Amino acid sequence: MTVAIKKTFKTIEDGIANMIAACNHDYKGTFYVGGDDEVHNKMIEEFNAGWVVKEGSKYTKISTKNGGCAWGFVVNTDNDKKFKKGDILKCAGFSAPARNAARGNVLDGGFSINWTGPLYLVGPAGYSIKSTKEGIFG
């Protein structure tokens, strides 16, 4: 399941907070089967509480599991040669972003996201696999 993010924001912090809320919603929808299952509720609670957002000079790093798993990066400067402020980048490794293409922009909205991280790219337009499938099949 993916969540479409359509809202626009004026600050990186607000855009990231909205994106994390969407990821939390996606996580709950992926694993929650209903009822008052204690295990599912604990998993959801731990996931929601485990986000770490660390601002650096060029990127804001977003991690899950209390910083143990790199989730993605957001460009937080206007001086990047390839990307604009707010662009979402997939992880190339634990401490570096993949600089091939942005997966969306937290300030502009208009992208899909899921709890596992920024979506993969397909084709020259940069549409994600899941977004493309939803458009064709759903």
What are these regions (language model features)?
Residues 2-53:
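Negatively charged, low-complexity tracts enriched in Asp/Glu with abundant Ser/Thr
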Residues 111-123, 127-132:
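Active-site-proximal segments of catalytic enzyme domains
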Residues 85-118:
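A short, surface-exposed interaction/processing loop segment used at functional sites
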Residues 41-84, 89:
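Amphipathic, interaction-prone secondary-structure segments
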Residues 132-138:
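Short acidic DE-rich linear segments
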